[in-house]
């Protein structure tokens, strides 16, 4: 009950989400330039706001150092770690809170471990002696052994470590703020954790960033570094896979770049919301977490959406190409791209949204359960990033994809003949050369990009004195044993020896930079880049850039619609030679979706009821089907009546009406709400429907037709059967089958061919009769088996057809039920309908001859037995009972079949006879007779379901006079050459190939009997070849070579 209640709700949610995506994507496709403009402006505003708020706050926050500001020790304590050692911690280092150490009056020993790093220091400077002169006597700093690792040599960094009483830390840091170097005009200066508010050059900023990276790497865990390195390596591989996937879809650069740009926008939006909510974001955690977030979320959803859109676009394009040339210039061309987007939404929209919801939910759980930890803070940011990525996928990226498809459609002459190919579009009433147009567009778009890049750079280099953070971007805590392991060991030994409670605060390493003693550069040597940025700061520079941006956007907004919809009002240009019509085998049959109807449903229904349905479009008729006004199964009848009632100028043939019915049914099926998630793609699928004679199908072979299935058809042989050579047609999707049968035919031909015998010919039908009592049923059985009753039933039966002649009656009783098995000839027809009509008349005659109390329970009581394996068919036969035999020379067995006679005989006995008996098989004493029977049945229009009893077969093999004798006995072969699927054109052609199509002109039933002999001979060839392959051990290798082909690549 619960599951039943949930399913409709899920379907409703899916329907609402899909409709919402339809509305959003439809709007952005109608206004692509506006969508790109709004998204770009919002993104630019957001990242400028984030940058300005972040870096200005950083510059004015704690730790800023100006000439007028006092020395701030707290800025150096950010990220420090305090440890305690004593009896309370069992003389082990224990992490503690700094407030406990500074507020506890019992603590007599509180040390600060300070590491000073001098990048690129000279050999003469590699001694602490040059610091002593700067230290006052009141500072009791003691040098200790600095801690080094692998990255020390890479960074070319010289470090000094000191143990300073915590109460004297401020005096020590102020004393070592500036340190003299071996160069008179330069000195070492502390690089403050949060900058000094001074602008720096681009090269210096990059250098500081590299040194900062090496500095962090030197004090990081090796395992952490390896994991982060693997993360970034995998990130690069993910980016490469994105570009490769988009390249396979036909875009070398722009679509992949658009996906990355959309992801960058999502990051900016997510960071803006996160900082606005007051959630602190760790910049180092960002650098560590973003690669793994990208690896987890990936680019699979944009790729899926792109693939679905391109697939739908290609299908619609193929559908338009199958129409006449005049149809290429109607409104369907305009709606091709939006319809492709909507089809992609139907196919992948809900699945993509579902994936996004799962990812957002998982990240939200991480943010809720661990809100105050770095992991929870990153989950909060990541959840917003994924949310904005989902929004941008169906807005910003969908717009770019729509524009890309429009450009591709305009550049493809096979898709649409543009009227302005030779003259170009017009701007403000003037013709524009396409080359100049491309150059102008490149300059304008480049101006927009340059404006944003320089605006971003101006914030970096105007404000940053290094790599900065603000209150929202806090530093990470240092690892004390990575930074000062040697110093901690020295303090541990001293404290343990003296038994003194000791606190140690390990500061993050303090880095020095080499600075000029005076002004580093004069006004006359101002960097060119800074001059450019200063120029951009002026009102005139900003005004010029904004003007160029507005003009670029206006130009694109004017050009793209002009190129999309500017077609010639006259007739289309005539091509040099008309293209030949596409055959159904060469072009898949995709259905172009018509433009939405402008008439309301009430108007459509009124026209239909007023017998004016000939004026309705396919889309409107499909809507009538969906609303239940036209039954789906009666579309052929409805459209046939519409065609016959139309005027002479609009009259269509019966075949055209039936083809249109199939097309409308496909549209109705694809739009059925209850199955749209599964059947929504049937309208534009590769299932063909054109160029088929549905007049032969209607009322004979199939109902609710939506197309036809092309099936591979092969020919085995030629094979000599009863002295006549035949090619045997086989329709199958199983590799090796036709090849194997051909090998069997070759082997049989060397022995003179196959010889067949027809042992019986009679179709059966077994009705079930009910009587008031078992005694009454027994009386009826005696009457049926008596000469009088037999004659009455025979006369009534034979009167129904000139071909039907009753042969035998087999009667069986079960309680009050009586089963009578009628067996009769049926000419060249398979005969099920013929015998059913005769049985019905015979039972009426029986009722009139003394059995008015008889009740016909069913006309087919499974005593036939039809489409079921049964012993009565195996023993008594049904249809044609055929035997086929052949003698294979021993030399052929060795050279052609690659085995020997004794092995074949033993295999047949052990497998086909004993093995089937052990399995309790009924008529299955063969290797694979059903394979051959079904393949020939499909090729010649037989009833596929009757393969069940027709495949009953026993294969025998003997060694006679040194040669192999093989025979197959098939007692219930049910075939016909008229009626059913034999009326179809393709199947009829295969009957012509065998010379057995239709009824025999002089000998009724001869064609059907000949077909049964051919089928039995084909089974004989298949059995011989397959058993030989099994005996030689070649079966698996043959199937792996011929039936396991790799998927073909679309790229040629």
Swiss-Prot record:
Applied relevance: Monacoline K acts as an inhibitor of HMG-CoA reductase involved in cholesterogenesis. Its hypocholesterolemic activity might be useful for lowering cholesterol levels in the blood and reduce artherosclerosis and coronary heart disease.
Region (Catalytic): 618-1044
Renumbered residue ranges of the record's region Disordered: 571-594
Catalytic-site annotation from UniProt: 734, 867, 943, 1039
Compartment list: Endoplasmic reticulum membrane
Annotated GO biological process: coenzyme A metabolic process; ergosterol biosynthetic process; isoprenoid biosynthetic process
Pathway(s) where this gene product acts: Polyketide biosynthesis; lovastatin biosynthesis
Topology in the lipid bilayer: Multi-pass membrane protein
InterPro entries: HMG-CoA_N_dom, HMG_CoA_Rdtase, HMG_CoA_Rdtase_cat_sf, HMG_CoA_Rdtase_CS, HMG_CoA_Rdtase_eu_arc, HMG_CoA_Rdtase_N, HMG_CoA_Rdtase_NAD(P)-bd_sf, HMG_CoA_Rdtase_sub-bd_dom_sf
Compositionally biased residues, Low complexity: 584-594
Protein keywords: Endoplasmic reticulum, Glycoprotein, Membrane, NADP, Oxidoreductase, Transmembrane, Transmembrane helix
Residues carrying sugar: 798, 1043
Region (Linker): 461-617
Function, in words: HMG-CoA reductase; part of the gene cluster that mediates the biosynthesis of monakolin K, also known as lovastatin, and which acts as a potent competitive inhibitor of HMG-CoA reductase. Monakolin K biosynthesis is performed in two stages. The first stage is catalyzed by the nonaketide synthase mokA, which belongs to type I polyketide synthases and catalyzes the iterative nine-step formation of the polyketide.
Protein name in the entry: 3-hydroxy-3-methylglutaryl coenzyme A reductase mokG
Annotated organism of origin: Monascus pilosus
């Amino acid at each position: 009950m619960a599951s039943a209640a949930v399913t409709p709700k899920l379907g409703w949610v899916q329907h609402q989400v899909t409709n919402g995506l339809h509305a959003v994507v439809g709007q952005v496709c109608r206004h692509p330039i506006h969508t790109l403009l709004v998204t770009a402006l919002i993104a630019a505003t957001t990242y400028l706001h984030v940058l300005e708020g972040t870096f200005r706050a950083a510059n004015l926050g704690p730790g800023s150092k100006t000439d007028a500001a006092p020395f701030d020790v707290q800025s150096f304590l950010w990220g420090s770690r305090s440890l305690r050692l004593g009896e309370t911690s069992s003389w082990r280092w224990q992490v503690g809170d700094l407030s406990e150490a500074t507020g506890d009056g019992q603590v007599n020993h509180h040390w600060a471990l300070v590491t000073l790093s001098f990048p690129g220091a000279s050999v003469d400077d590699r001694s602490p002696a040059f610091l002593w002169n700067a230290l006052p006597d009141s500072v009791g700093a003691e040098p200790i052994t600095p801690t080094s690792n692998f990255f020390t040599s890479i960074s070319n960094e010289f470090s000094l470590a000191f143990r300073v009483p915590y109460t004297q830390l401020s005096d020590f840091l102020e004393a070592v703020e500036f340190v003299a170097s071996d160069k008179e005009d330069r000195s070492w200066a502390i690089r403050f954790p949060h900058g000094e508010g001074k602008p720096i050059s681009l090269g210096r900023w990059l250098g500081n960033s590299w040194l900062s990276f090496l500095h962090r790497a030197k004090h990081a865990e090796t395992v952490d570094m390896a994991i982060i390195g693997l993360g970034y390596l995998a990130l690069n591989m993910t980016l490469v896979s994105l570009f490769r996937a988009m390249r396979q879809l036909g875009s070398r650069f722009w679509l992949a770049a658009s996906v990355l740009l959309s992801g960058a926008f999502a990051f900016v939006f997510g960071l803006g919301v996160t900082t606005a909510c007051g959630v602190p974001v760790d910049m180092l955690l960002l650098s560590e977490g973003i690669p793994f977030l990208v690896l987890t979320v990936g680019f699979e959803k944009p790729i899926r959406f792109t693939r679905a859109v391109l697939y739908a676009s290609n299908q619609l394009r193929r559908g338009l190409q199958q129409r006449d040339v005049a149809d290429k210039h109607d409104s369907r061309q305009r709606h091709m791209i939006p319809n492709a987007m909507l089809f992609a939404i139907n196919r992948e929209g809900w699945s993509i949204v579902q994936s996004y919801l799962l990812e957002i939910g998982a990240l939200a759980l991480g943010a809720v359960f661990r809100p105050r930890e770095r992991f929870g803070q990153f989950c909060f940011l990541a959840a917003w990033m994924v949310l904005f990525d989902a929004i941008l996928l169906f807005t910003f990226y969908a717009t770019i994809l729509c524009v890309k498809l429009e450009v591709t459609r305009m550049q493809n002459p096979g898709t649409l003949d543009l009227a302005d190919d030779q003259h170009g579009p017009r701007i403000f009433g003037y013709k524009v050369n396409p080359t100049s147009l491309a150059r102008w567009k490149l300059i304008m778009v480049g101006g927009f990009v340059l404006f944003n890049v320089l605006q971003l750079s101006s914030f970096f280099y105007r404000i940053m004195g290094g790599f900065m953070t603000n209150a929202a971007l806090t530093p990470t805590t240092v690892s004390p044993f990575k930074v000062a392991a040697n110093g901690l060991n020295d303090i541990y030994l001293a404290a343990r020896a003296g038994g003194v409670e000791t606190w140690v605060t390990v500061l993050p390493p303090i880095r020095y930079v080499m600075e000029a003693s005076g002004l580093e550069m004069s006004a006359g040597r101002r960097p060119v880049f800074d001059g450019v940025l200063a120029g951009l700061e002026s009102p005139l520079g900003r005004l010029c850039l904004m003007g160029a941006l507005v003009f670029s956007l206006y130009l694109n907004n004017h050009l793209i619609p002009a190129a999309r919809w500017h077609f010639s009002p006259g007739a289309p240009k005539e091509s040099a030679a008309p293209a030949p019509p596409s055959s159904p085998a060469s072009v898949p049959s995709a259905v172009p979706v018509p433009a939405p109807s402008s008439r309301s449903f009430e108007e459509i229904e009124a026209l239909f009821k007023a017998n004016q349905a000939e004026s309705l479009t396919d889309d409107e008729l499909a809507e009538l089907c969906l609303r239940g006004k036209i039954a789906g199964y009666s579309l052929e009848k409805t459209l046939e009546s519409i065609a016959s009632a139309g005027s002479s100028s609009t009259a269509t043939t019966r075949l055209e009406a039936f083809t249109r019915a199939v097309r409308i049914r496909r549209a109705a099926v694809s739009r059925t709400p209850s199955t749209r998630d599964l059947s929504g793609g049937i309208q534009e699928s590769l299932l063909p429907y054109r160029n088929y004679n549905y007049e032969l199908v209607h009322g004979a072979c199939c109902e609710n037709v939506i197309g036809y299935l092309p099936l591979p058809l092969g020919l085995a042989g030629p094979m000599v059967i009863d002295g006549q050579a035949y090619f045997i047609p086989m329709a199958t999707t199983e590799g090796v089958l036709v090849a194997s049968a051909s090998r069997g035919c070759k082997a049989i031909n060397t022995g003179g061919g196959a010889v067949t015998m027809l042992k019986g010919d009679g179709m059966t039908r077994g009705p079930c009769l009910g009587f008031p009592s078992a005694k009454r049923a027994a009386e009826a059985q005696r009457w049926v088996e008596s000469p009088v009753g037999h004659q009455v039933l025979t006369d009534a039966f034979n009167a129904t057809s000139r071909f039907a002649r009753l042969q035998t009656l087999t009667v069986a009783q079960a309680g009050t039920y009586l089963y009578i098995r009628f067996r009769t000839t049926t000419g060249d027809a398979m005969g099920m309908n013929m015998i059913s009509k005769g049985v019905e008349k015979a039972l009426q005659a029986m009722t009139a001859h003394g059995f008015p109390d008889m009740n016909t329970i069913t006309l087919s009581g499974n005593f036939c037995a039809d489409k079921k394996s049964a012993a009565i068919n195996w023993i008594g036969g049904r249809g044609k009972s055929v035997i086929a035999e052949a003698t294979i020379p021993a030399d052929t067995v060795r050279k052609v079949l690659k085995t020997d006679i004794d092995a074949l005989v033993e295999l047949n006995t052990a497998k086909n006879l004993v093995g089937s008996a052990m399995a309790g098989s009924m008529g299955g004493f063969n290797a694979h007779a059903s394979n051959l029977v079904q393949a020939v049945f499909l090729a010649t229009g037989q009833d596929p379901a009757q393969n069940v009893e027709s495949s009953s077969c026993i294969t025998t093999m003997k060694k006679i006079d040194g040669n192999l004798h093989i025979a197959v006995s098939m007692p219930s072969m049910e075939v016909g050459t008229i009626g059913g699927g034999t009326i179809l054109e393709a199947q009829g052609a295969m009957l012509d190939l065998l010379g057995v199509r239709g009824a025999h002109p002089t000998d009724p039933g001869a064609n059907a009997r000949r077909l049964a002999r051919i089928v039995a001979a084909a089974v004989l060839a298949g059995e011989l070849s397959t058993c030989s392959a099994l005996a030689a051990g070649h079966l698996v290798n043959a199937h792996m070579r011929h039936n396991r082909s790799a998927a073909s690549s679309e790229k040629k």
